[in-house]
Amino acid sequence: MSEVAELAAFREEVRAWLEANCPAEMREPVRDESDMCWGGRNARFKNEAQKLWMERMAERGWTVPDWPTDYGGGGLSPAETKILKQEMARIGARNPLMSFGISMLGPALLKYGSEAQKKRFLPEIARGEIRWCQGYSEPGAGSDLASLQTRCEDKGDHWLVNGQKVWTSYADKADWIFCLVRTDPKAPKHKGISFLLFDMASPGVSTKPILLISGSSPFCETFFDDVKVPKDQVVGEVDKGWDVAKYLLGHEREMISGMGLGGQTGSLGEAFADLLADDPILRADMARFDVDAMAYRAMSERFIDELKAGMAHPAQPSMMKYAGTELNKARHELVMAAGGSNALEWESDRSKKGKA
């Protein structure tokens, strides 16, 4: 059988499996954070369908379809992974598991982690059994991240961590943290940094949610006071954590570029076809947007392939983030132009029930 025929057969298999196994509730647009499944040891599911969808996908290894099967993945090729995503988009299937472990830490562990670290953490990430947060930014180290000052001292049989992180997304809900710490304070600022993993339930770890003007608190201040961490929880080499951090940031931007269209996969022109017949200007604007969206998706796929092959230009992640943000802004403006003030209401007919 040719490769084309094999992929066609795989598509049919995926389509049939998704139709049989994706609950109807998981084929609706994500309206708020409660519609997202984050997993973790204290996971809260909005309904049984959300839990069932995550478990079924994890059993197939399709929460992380391109990871090796030895680590809980599906072992799919890039072409097969693309087909899976296309077929999920075709029926409007939700992402079964939102996870910084999947989008950021996992790729870094696959590249830099020890075999013991991979076997310990990756299957738990794939099954949604562990929720991670990212300990990068500090009060004095934001855009200049390498200026971080969180201290990590070698105490012989363990590391001792003291310091503070800020803007730590969902730190108050996370089970573990991947954290940048300074292990050599005398080294140049990009040196002497190590990439450390530790349990957020460790003695000495505390969090303080940051209240935003919206009333929500997705970010936290995170404090470390004499936190003891086992020696084998450094990823990569001691004092060379900056390499791991940069690699991880590339995958974080991959995740962000994938969100550039706000999770929407359909055509605006098709969604608003009933409103466009008498408005040639709006019809042309939406057609132009749909073409731009197709180009962005193609560019995003190319970027992801180059990133995984180690061929991405250093400026590409930032370029994708900027392009995606501008495109998503244009989408919202067009939805408002088509639906008027009624489009502000997520469930309204003019907002296409959140599908536009």
Question: Over which residues does each language-model region extend?
Answer:
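A short, Trp-centered hydrophobic/proline-enriched beta-strand micro-motif
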Residues: G128-Y136, L180
